Regions:
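Bacterial Sec-dependent N-terminal signal peptides
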Residues: 1-28
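Intrinsic disorder/low-complexity segments enriched in polar/small residues
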Residues: 4, 97-98
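Solvent-exposed, non-transmembrane amphipathic alpha-helical segments
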Residues: 4, 75, 92, 121-123
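Central antiparallel beta-sheet cores of small beta-barrel/beta-sandwich binding domains
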Residues: 27-96, 102-112
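Edge beta-strands of extracellular beta-sandwich domains
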Residues: 113-118
Length: 127
């Protein structure tokens, strides 16, 4: 009887240890991702509406909404988006500690840092 109780106790203990030790794994998910592109001393507020294999781009300061994009690739922790009408491309990777995406926004041969986070509410704020 004591052997069964000890076995059960250690089994539960191991399950708890594995459950608590599991790292949170963030991934590129569908939704409205908002953030900023840092252009020198200025910040440009942008948004990406990811759905399925598609994506639309919004540039909030310029009031450009629903700009068509091409998703070049998308995997569990990164995405590459081409914006042909702006001659721009962005490559983003999930940051494991906070679930945001960071990367570079390239346009006309120049690169700028970009950071976006998943926004629960799709609101278009005026600058």
């Amino acid at each position: 009887m004591l052997k069964h109780i000890l076995f059960l106790f250690f089994t539960i203990l191991l399950l708890v240890i594995f459950a608590l030790g599991k790292k949170t794994h963030y991934q590129v998910v569908n939704g409205y991702w908002t953030g900023t592109v840092n252009i020198g001393k200025e910040c440009l507020h942008v948004a990406f509406n990811l759905s399925g294999n598609g994506c639309e781009f919004d540039c909030l300061e310029q009031k450009a909404y629903g700009v068509k994009t091409d998703v070049l690739y998308r995997n569990h922790d990164s995405i590459c988006i081409d914006i042909p009408s702006l001659n721009a491309q962005t490559k983003l990777t999930i940051i494991q500690k906070n679930g945001k995406m960071k990367g570079l926004f390239r346009q006309y041969g120049k690169s700028y840092p970009i950071e976006i986070g998943l926004n629960d509410i799709r609101t278009r704020k005026r600058p």
